[in-house]
Amino acid sequence: PTPFENDTGNRHPDDPIRIACRKNLISNIRSDVAGSIKTDGLDPHEIAFKAKDACGFDTELLQATWEEKVRKYHERIETIKAQMLEKGTSSSSSSSGSETLNAATRAVSGRFVGVADISGSMTWEGTPGNRPIDIATGLTVFMSEVAAPEYRNIAFSFNMIPQALSFVKNIGGESVPMTASERMSVICNENIVGYNTDIMNLHKMVI
């Protein structure tokens, strides 16, 4: 199925019973796979790059892998926060100790927004899937997933005409976060990829 047919499939897409069966099958497959997915050896951009051009069940499997990577990241951050809190309460309440703890807390707070350089020079080195542009876009969309709620699902492109990117779609009047594949389609849109960059315009947009 094409990306536009993911919800219904391309065989009898008007049959509600078949659509329901398809969704149940996909849900069961993803549930079974999620428990056995090992993501420790995978970088976010590797998953995102494959998801960008995936179709059919490959899309579902890669999305399950992506979600597991996001879950593991949040799990790791919570562990780090707990360790920091324990270290902070067990250490002396000196000014320097408090400042160190506050700085570390800010570092794992998730208050960040990714910026991806999508200019032409990012495509000159490496092989597809591991070029600078693949790493930049993949990590940027991953950051948009794991950022704090108020910074989540957004990013900026760094090119001749920098743009603010939204990774939210409207379904039935509701705002729904995009999948990894959909996020990559937005950030890799050929209409915004350019050959030059404009750092001043980017700063103005962010500010």
Locations of regions flagged by a protein language model:
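Long lumenal/extracellular ectodomains of secretory and single-pass membrane proteins
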Residues: 1-135, 145-207
